């Protein structure tokens, strides 16, 4: 197959919808990261189902460490699926976990479930109490 370039998040979602239909996946999850400079990044994510798609973000974060952020995203997805969250709630929880991990030094997520749930992905000024 020929390689297709995508330049926007919306184009990526459209391509993943085609992929989902072709290979009959129940759900596909994806993330996007835009580097804004000075250790500031904009994050968002999406889930594509067989009938629709859901997005979360963008959220801006000050990055302390990127190691383990993808693992944290997947952990958030699995937590949402295992607890029978809706696709939108799952992707919101996963984005919160993904974004929070960017603020934690080290290769694993130490934020609690409560920290993840309290993270407001719609608010640009987030205070994390530890």
Residue ranges and their predicted role:
Residues 118-130:
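Glycine/Thr-rich phosphate-binding loops that ligate phosphate moieties of nucleotide
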Residues 16-19, 116, 126:
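Generic hydrophobic, helix-prone segments enriched in Leu/Val/Ile
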Residues 27-29, 47, 67-71, 130:
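Short charge-dense sequence patches
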Residues 1-50:
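Conserved phosphate/ATP/ADP-binding segment of small-molecule kinases
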Residues 57-121:
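Conserved post-catalytic alpha-helical subdomain immediately downstream of the catalytic base
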């Amino acid at each position: 197959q020929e390689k297709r370039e995508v330049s926007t998040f919306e184009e990526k979602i459209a391509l993943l919808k085609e992929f989902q239909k072709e290979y009959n996946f129940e759900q596909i999850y994806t993330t996007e990261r835009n580097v804004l400079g000075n250790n500031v990044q904009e994050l968002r994510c999406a889930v594509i189902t067989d009938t629709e798609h859901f997005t979360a973000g963008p959220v801006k974060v000050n990055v302390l460490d990127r190691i383990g952020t993808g693992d944290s995203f997947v952990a958030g997805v699995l937590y949402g699926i295992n607890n029978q969250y809706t696709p939108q709630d799952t992707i919101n929880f996963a984005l919160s976990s993904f974004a929070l991990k960017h603020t934690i030094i080290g290769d694993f997520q130490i934020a609690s479930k409560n920290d993840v749930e309290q993270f407001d992905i719609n608010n640009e000024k987030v205070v994390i109490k530890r």
